[in-house]
Amino acid sequence: GNGIDENIINNYSTEAATVFVVPVGNQGNTDTHTEGIIEKVGDIKDIEIRVGEKQKNLPIIIWINKPNRVMLSIISPTGEIIDNMEAKNTNNNRIKFLYEKTEMIVNFTSPELSTGDSHIFIRAYNLKAGIWKFRLTGEYIVDGNYYAWIPQRELIDDETKFLNPVKYTTITLPSTTNGAISVGYYNQNNNSVVSESGNGYTRNGSIKPDIVAGGSNALVTTPGGTTSVMTGSSVAGAVVAGCCAL
């Protein structure tokens, strides 16, 4: 990864006796990520998002690997379409849907400064429930890889999800950095895989997580000197951090 947090970790991780341990998150089975391949110029891929009744605002991020280029169309639940927006540098392109009364602000960045890839950032306001389609049409295609994310499950309505989710590439920032030990978790009580734990690879193909540790129904200490039972990659991250300290 090349984000601000990731670069900071990369820089400081080269110092002696310094180890960064980052949990990969618990988004493996939350339907908040999808990805796919546009085979050739003119091919169409629909990214479908079911928006829940309580979901009024939603950010959507789409990455297109360089040097591929696409056009974006957005189709509302009633069938209204904003057609063939080109993925070139535009800031705060405002579009409105007549029937839904929904407004979206679309930012294209191509190439994005740190990666050279195309980045589409969509902010949707006053969303109406139903299936929204974000249609990608190949304009210039080499390998055609694209990736899309919505916020983590805990931050959005339970009914809001991708209709064709992918469990891979679901590790959270900044665990994508090469300068940290990225930690997933498994069920140490029966030695089984846990579907909630974030899955690699990273978007640029780095192998993550680096390691997994037990993180299911673990007895942990809490403020005030009491104990509690917790589950998640943060528990596993704490175990690995302790091992590094030793």
Question: What are the roles of these predicted feature ranges?
Answer:
Residues 1-2, 23-24, 137-139:
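Short acidic, glycine-rich surface-loop motifs adjacent to enzyme active sites
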Residues 20-25, 183-184:
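Active-site neighborhood of phospho(di)ester-bond hydrolases with catalytic His/Asp-centered motifs
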Residues 30-119, 136-137, 163-245:
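Extracellular S/T/G-rich loop segment that most often corresponds to the catalytic His/Ser-adjacent loop
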Residues 56-58, 124-140:
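Noncatalytic modules at the cell exterior or secretory-pathway interfaces
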Residues 113, 130, 143:
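Flexible, polar/acidic helix-loop-strand segments at domain edges
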Residues 141-153:
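Edge beta-strands of jelly-roll/beta-sandwich modules across compartments, strongly enriched
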